């Protein structure tokens, strides 16, 4: 329970950082990793069972690759690092299992809890494009191309000067649009006029759905996957 509370505090701090500046300080995820290794090492010591510390180390390694895969898909590097932190901190948690995935999730060395947190966070994020679209419609944004129609669900249109102040990432203009921006490459606004309107990333970080998922996954487990499978008759 202590490690769950530490994880909740870490994700809350990360969410605040990400909402304010879209940058997550490294000390957040590093602290989660260090505490996780020490805490699980302590559990192994007092129980004379190496399973806890092994699960923590394996959880960190598996979640490193999961975080890297998320980064390749365009998710911020800070989000992936937080998943690494969860892998070391709380690789396993007594969550309810509602689907046949239970046999896989219950595998001894699989960091099932962080993986389930990411999966549920993806489901929670499904509603975000609808919110972004409605916000654009209310603002009177009118798409001119097929890609701009997609951007209505994925980004916001604003003046370059405003985007710079809000530290957004560039999606582009109607002539050249990129739907998956890179935090390293798509932050140079010098090629645009400051009064020009362009498409940029919305101010809805993925850390927030991760934080929400973290709190709820301990209660619902893989229930959302169960609902999804039942809808499609699987």
UniProtKB/Swiss-Prot annotation:
Its main location: membrane. The keyword ATP-binding does not apply. InterPro entries: Arch_preflagellin_pept, Preflagellin_Peptidase, Prepilin_IV_endopep_pep. Keywords: Archaeal flagellum biogenesis, Cell membrane, Hydrolase, Membrane, Protease, Transmembrane, Transmembrane helix. Residues 19-23, 73-78, 140-205 are extracellular. It catalyses: Cleaves the signal peptide of 3 to 12 amino acids from the N-terminal of preflagellin, usually at Arg-Gly-|- or Lys-Gly-|-, to release flagellin. Its EC number is 3.4.23.52. It is a multi-pass membrane protein. GO terms for molecular function: aspartic-type endopeptidase activity. It is found in: Cell membrane. Signal peptide: none annotated. The record marks 18, 79 as: Essential for catalysis. It is an enzyme of class 3 (hydrolase). Residues 1, 47-49, 90-110, 218-234 are cytoplasmic. NCBIfam families: FlaK_Arch (NF040695). Cleaves the N-terminal leader peptide from preflagellins. This is Preflagellin peptidase. The gene is flaK.
């Amino acid at each position: 329970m202590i490690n769950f509370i530490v994880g909740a505090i870490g994700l809350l701090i990360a969410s605040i950082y990400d909402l304010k500046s879209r940058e997550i300080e490294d000390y957040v995820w590093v602290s989660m990793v260090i505490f996780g290794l020490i805490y699980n090492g302590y559990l192994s010591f007092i129980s004379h069972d190496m399973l806890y510390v092994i699960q923590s180390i394996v959880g960190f390694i598996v979640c490193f690759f999961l975080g890297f895969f998320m980064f390749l898909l365009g998710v911020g590097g800070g989000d992936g690092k937080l998943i690494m932190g969860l892998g070391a901190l709380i690789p396993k948690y007594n969550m309810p299992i509602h689907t046949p995935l239970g046999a896989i999730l219950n595998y001894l060395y699989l960091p099932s809890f962080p993986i389930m947190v990411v999966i549920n966070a993806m489901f929670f994020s499904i509603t975000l494009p609808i919110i972004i679209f409605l916000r654009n419609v209310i603002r009177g944004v009118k798409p001119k191309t097929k890609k701009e129609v997609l951007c209505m669900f994925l980004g916001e249109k604003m003046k370059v000067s405003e985007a710079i102040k809000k530290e957004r990432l560039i999606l582009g203009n109607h002539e050249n649009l990129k739907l998956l921006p890179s935090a390293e490459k798509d932050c140079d606004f010098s090629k645009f006029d400051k009064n020009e309107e362009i498409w940029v990333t919305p101010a809805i970080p993925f850390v927030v759905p991760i934080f929400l998922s973290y709190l709820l996954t301990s209660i619902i487990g893989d229930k959302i996957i169960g609902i999804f499978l039942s809808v499609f008759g699987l």
